[in-house]
From Swiss-Prot:
Residues 31-133, 134-242, 243-347, 348-452, 453-562, 570-675 form the Cadherin domain. SMART domains: CA. It comes from Homo sapiens (Human). Residues 791-838, 899-929 are annotated as: Disordered. The gene is PCDHGB3. The keyword Cell membrane applies. Residues 31-691 are extracellular. This is Protocadherin gamma-B3. Residues 919-929 have a biased composition (Basic residues). GO terms for molecular function: calcium ion binding. Its main location: membrane.
Amino acid sequence: MGNSSGWRGPAGQRRMLFLFLLSLLDQALSEPIRYAIPEELDRGSLVGNLAKDLGFGVGDLPTRNLRVIAEKKFFTVSPENGNLLVSDRIDREEICGKKSTCVLEFEMVAEKPLNFFHVTVLIQDINDNPPTFSQNITELEISELALTGATFALESAQDPDVGVNSLQQYYLSPDPHFSLIQKENLDGSRYPELVLKAPLDREEQPHHHLVLTAVDGGEPSRSCTTQIRVIVADANDNPPVFTQDMYRVNVAENLPAGSSVLKVMAIDMDEGINAEIIYAFINIGKEVRQLFKLDSKTGELTTIGELDFEERDSYTIGVEAKDGGHHTAYCKVQIDISDENDNAPEITLASESQHIQEDAELGTAVALIKTHDLDSGFNGEILCQLKGNFPFKIVQDTKNTYRLVTDGALDREQIPEYNVTITATDKGNPPLSSSKTITLHILDVNDNVPVFHQASYTVHVAENNPPGASIAHVRASDPDLGPNGLVSYYIVASDLEPRELSSYVSVSARSGVVFAQRAFDHEQLRAFELTLQARDQGSPTLSANVSLRVLVDDRNDNAPLVLYPALGPEGSALFDMVPRSAEPGYLVTKVVAVDADSGYNAWLSYHIVQASEPGLFSLGLRTGEVRTARTLGDREAARQRLLVTVRDGGQQPLSATVMLHLIFADSLQEIQPDLSDRPTPSDPQAELQFHLVVALALISVLFLLAVILAISLRLRCSSRPATEGYFQPGVCFKTVPGVLPTYSERTLPYSYNPCAASHSSNTEFKFLNIKAENAAPQDLLCDEASWFESNDNPEMPSNSGNLQKQAPPNTDWRFSQAQRPGTSGSQNGDDTGTWPNNQFDTEMLQAMILASASEAADGSSTLGGGAGTMGLSARYGPQFTLQHVPDYRQNVYIPGSNATLTNAAGKRDGKAPAGGNGNKKKSGKKEKK
């Protein structure tokens, strides 16, 4: 009930109307489109509007691409309006011969979607051919004894036209002895016969001349004539007679040449020459004469050519029997040709394009196939199929039309093309078949992502590389074709931020070669990572990423930098004091140097280049420790010089040199004559300052002697007070390394603020102020409260009475066992250090040096560090916590003393360590002074 009510409404009526129209359209498309035209139309003549008859609009023509599929194209389709036009000469007689109906059949193909349309064109005959006789003159011999009413066969005229345009009538010129009758063959063609109206008399008229005219039925009619010459022969009263008026025979089309078809026979009751019969063809065309032969004596009909059912299926032949007396008889021979399976099927591809995209859906039409077999019946029925295993199949549309469609997934990267063999087989016995191979090209689509040849890339680049040099080459492959497989390379990310990426590296979009845009510095940038992207040119674009890690390898491009000893202001030399009683192995001083490079390029060695007294001192190869090799002789000079070279371990080693000035003396007073040997111009102000400084120095020496005596009694070990400086113009005692708040271009820059005497013309002391930016670090030997300010400082009066007192040195400085230079604190002769195991340890060490130097610049580094810091203040560089590196942690010593440092609890503020009460009391007295 619900369904019937749904069809009754407006929607149901529209649905029924749509189904009705759809059925009509389907019926119309399934039936062939028929046209009728006369033959011999001019080229370009209109046959019909095919597009309109197919239901196509003018706008659909460019996309549907209508075209004719036929073995011989007599027609074409106009792409502008869809008209079916004549493209070649159409001669009905040449195409169809004597067939009553001449039809040209062909297929029309339309694309998008792909469809077949069957078209038939009926070719109408026009009267374009006149009747013709094979001979202009025909001789006919008739016995004078011929009876009235006797008939004589005449040559028929041939007219290729059919229907009303064919031969319709024969006319004979008027004659009292003869008349003309017309008869029809089984096929409807007419032939004339001459009838004797009156007896002939050879003696009265031996010859008769007649004119035979053949006229067709066209409008206007066409005609032709032939001359008939009748010869009156002598009497022969018995004509031959055939055993049959019509002979019929059926032969196979594959009958070989020379085979007998049949035998005709005529009987003549006469005797002698009048009974001798001669057989001959009569009223036949040229085609029959090329296929058959008649024996004139026996009447046997044989083949001389190959019969073909597909060209013609039957022949009607006239045979004449003539005796010696010129009597004749006539019969007809009907030869029917039976079909044999002698024609293999023919395959025609109706589609021009043989390309298909690899992402085509199942059932997509690839090619249109048309088959044809000239045989008939079962011999002409065709089965079409594929040969081989392919992702395609054949779908039949009509009797002889098929579609090749996809039946599986296509992948151009695996199989770029298919050679498909199509086989058509008929149903004859035995069956015949034919094959045709077509090549189907698979069109590429962008379905493959570029793939890098490596999962990740790591390259090493030596620093100081030339800008623009290639540092890496990444490669990616894309199996697609054309733009889909054309790969371009881009840098999409890096860890160089906030640095500008374009100023460091670039990549060639075509080749994937990565170029350095600048020279890299291992000391500033040791490694960075890039993310490169390979992108194809397809639509949509597909891409893949890969990481490229660039490791900047170190080169030996930084020479060692000597931290200690350093030159004073204006290049003045520094001196170290050595006790005259120093035993062999006594630690005199230590050369401290650093190298901004890494690895073996920063592995330093120390060498004595020149010595004022060779053999007096030894130098640790790796530690830089200067020790006495023997005791000082009595005649040897107290003032010694050593020229020390520091070399790194690079392939082409770099070096730095430093001059050490050493004085053998047991007290400060002993060195004063050496310091004042140089004559200087007299300056009253300088002399005053000199006396003040000397007085202060004497007081300090007395105080230090008292402190040293107390400590020696307590600790039962001898020690010598450290001297603060040498009082001589142009000479400075100890330099104070301090770390700048901001680093220079090198990795570990140091600034040294010496506590030195200025170069003046008088033998006086001027103590310079510490620079403001370097004031935060504290000196190991004297703090800021112990410095004497020069008269150049406006905040300090020039009188010597207001000079501040210097705090005594801390005599309880010793290295612990863990703090001693080298691998153990007790060794002296170890000139080789243990280098870090790998570059990472070295880089970690340098990072710690930088961090410690930064703390020193902030004033946070103190003298008494924990275990492993070696007791260094910020002025002597960063606090070292690694015990296995001999470069920096061993290069610390107490100038002028062989005592080792320990962690002091108190600062150098004039107070002794908490462990010694006597020292504390003496320090308090000095403060009161």
